[in-house]
Amino acid sequence: MAHIAAAAGVSKNTVSLALRGSARVSQKTRAAVERCAAALGYTRNAAIGCLMAEMRRTGSARFNATLALLNANEDKHAFQTHPTLPVYIAGARRRAELLGYALDEFWLHDPKISGERLAGILRARGIRGALVIGLLQTNQLPNRMACIWEEFPAVVTGVRTRNPELSFAGADQYSLALRAYEMAWSIGYRRPGLVLDPVIDTLIDGRFTAGFLIGQQNFRPRGARIQPFTQIAQARKNLQCFQSWLNRSRPDVLFTLYHEVEDWLTKCGYNIPKDIGLIQYEWRAQRSHWAGMDQRNDLVGEAAVDLVVSMIHNGVRGIPKQPIATQVTSQWVEGKTIRIGG
């Protein structure tokens, strides 16, 4: 510590604070200390980091660490009103509390707070890392918040962001879709179809469609391919396009993200599950009669906390050169929208 202090021209206490990422040390000084530490071959003691985490978890120390919980949704109240976001947050809070961290919530689209001001608030509160939750229709973070990602370790939940690309935790949508196909086939369905908005699929790099198509390839190698129905916006205005697709494709079970498809089928004269089955790609407790895949978004929230805490312990800050992805396996849930025997 003394050698680093001498090389950087600061006190040993400043070195200690800088290497812990303390907000009490300016970003410029912290960077200088880190350069000197690296030049002198300094490495962090992983055992000490684990000890501090355990002390925070058990309450044996009064250290009160805090993470920022950043609402990236355009709706300020999405954390309370959206059907799935509260599940991510519940998992994140549970894991953060276990590790001794509090969560302070901020809205990224608040017109009264610039990126620079938010960064200043995080420093003042001693916040050293951030969780980004709420990206649903885009994988782009607000440009005016660029300084946040450049200074603080941050992990996104649900989707992989672009420009910048940050580390993220999310459901494994490819294996989810393939597993759903496997389950449908094992039950007895032989003509599974997919109802999905291409905007959503593009957001997750086509992983839902990829899993579905590989399922077709594996289980229907000689059968005619059933093309996904993607005209969601049009069907919401006029069901004729959906009805035409059903008549043409003749699916016996549908995979989808949209509960309204149940109403569409009823209006088209189908009895569920007698005439056709329904499997939800994102099963929700609010519609527990559906069969589907529980994405375990609570575990995604937990994984995001683990990832950002690991980054803090290892002194990782800023936009990563090699972002890390943590994917959570989904769980099959039985329901009344399918019938045994297909």
Region locations from a protein language model:
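N-terminal helix-turn-helix DNA-binding module of bacterial transcription factors
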Residues: 1-57
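Periplasmic-binding protein-like
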Residues: 68-69, 126-135, 155, 191-198, ...
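Flexible loop/turn connectors
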Residues: 244-342
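Short beta-strand elements in bilobed, periplasmic/extracellular small-molecule ligand-binding domains
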Residues: 93-109, 164, 192-195, 206-239, ...
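Amphipathic helical "hinge" segments at domain boundaries
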Residues: 2, 40-119, 128, 198, ...
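Flexible loop/hinge segments that line or gate small-molecule binding clefts
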Residues: 133-176, 280-291
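Hydrophobic alpha-helical segments within soluble ligand-binding/sensing domains
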Residues: 167-194, 235-243, 295-316
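An alpha-beta-alpha
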Residues: 180-219, 318-339
